[in-house]
Amino acid sequence: MLENDIKKVLVSHDEITEAAKKLGAQLTKDYAGKNPILVGILKGSIPFMAELVKHIDTHIEMDFMMVSSYHGGTASSGVINIKQDVTQDIKGRHVLFVEDIIDTGQTLKNLRDMFKEREAASVKIATLLDKPEGRVVEIEADYTCFTIPNEFVVGYGLDYKENYRNLPYIGVLKEEVYSN
């Protein structure tokens, strides 16, 4: 049972759903008539993005990128590897990155800078979780659902070695699970 590896539930499924509803309402107002491209960062953003888009009541397009900066461990390497780029030309378009968590900030800072170079009309960031204590670069999300302490979290898309993504909540992983 996956629950046996969880120290505590940090954010419940109901809290995530409610936060996605509120954020969806805000994005509906902010992007009305702009037809933004929501870019989900794979793989972790899938559950959050799927919940979020159900609550956005304006035209949007969706695309995805697969970018890695974690290489099987618990700390970001700082090296950004784009495994899959967006399929659309974003020049002149409003782009909203949808992310599961901002930790060091390196991945999103690099992506934001890259999309500005591609001449996007605007580049903003929405994240389910923000962990400011982990930040090593200057970057802030434009939309944040939850600010969390500097603990190793899994669930709702977040993983440890590709496991735990399917938990319906955000939980703190027991240290003995990842320290071995």
Swiss-Prot record:
Location in the cell reads: Cytoplasm
GO terms, biological process:
GMP salvage; guanine salvage; hypoxanthine metabolic process; IMP salvage; purine ribonucleoside salvage
Q: Where does Mg(2+) bind?
A: E99, D100
Which GO-annotated molecular functions does the record name?
guanine phosphoribosyltransferase activity; hypoxanthine phosphoribosyltransferase activity; magnesium ion binding; nucleotide binding
Query: What's the Enzyme Commission number for this chain?
Result: 2.4.2.8
- Top EC group: transferase
Catalysed reaction(s) here are:
IMP + diphosphate = hypoxanthine + 5-phospho-alpha-D-ribose 1-diphosphate; GMP + diphosphate = guanine + 5-phospho-alpha-D-ribose 1-diphosphate
Disulfide links within the chain: none
For the ligand (GMP), the binding residues are: K131, F152, V153, D159
* Active site, renumbered: D103 (proton acceptor)
Tell me the cofactors it needs.
Answer: Mg(2+)
> Can you tell me which family this protein belongs to?
Belongs to the purine/pyrimidine phosphoribosyltransferase family.
Q: What does this protein do?
A: Purine salvage pathway enzyme that catalyzes the transfer of the ribosyl-5-phosphate group from 5-phospho-alpha-D-ribose 1-diphosphate (PRPP) to the N9 position of the 6-oxopurines hypoxanthine and guanine to form the corresponding ribonucleotides IMP (inosine 5'-monophosphate) and GMP (guanosine 5'-monophosphate), with the release of PPi.
Q: What is this protein called?
A: Hypoxanthine-guanine phosphoribosyltransferase
The species this protein belongs to is Streptococcus pneumoniae (strain ATCC BAA-255 / R6)
